[in-house]
Amino acid sequence: YLSAQALRAARIVVDIGMHLGFKDFDGKVWNAESSRKLLNEQALLDEEHSRSETDRYLGWPGQAISYKVGERVWMKAREDAKARLGSEFSLKKFHTYALKIGPMGLDPFAAELANWDGN
């Protein structure tokens, strides 16, 4: 769990750093080399995976941060449903319902999940 969170955090740093021209930890503008270095050292990726991740974020600006925002909305909706439904909450039913909703923006998605009755 923690290693996955470290990777997600590193992806956000890389994505934002490379696309907004921020300085890396060595005081240089973020580039593919500094991205791979961070992913190797902080997210513990091997060279092949750090290269692949770097290419991914060079070609898909904003993907890392949008993924993390979506994850937070999903997790909050799930925690709210657990609190609202108590012992009636079913993780499997929650996920089934959430996936059946289909694609939509995060605000309508959160509102839809807030109205879920557990069935």
Residue locations for each model-derived region?
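N-terminal maturation segment of proteins
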Residues: 1-119
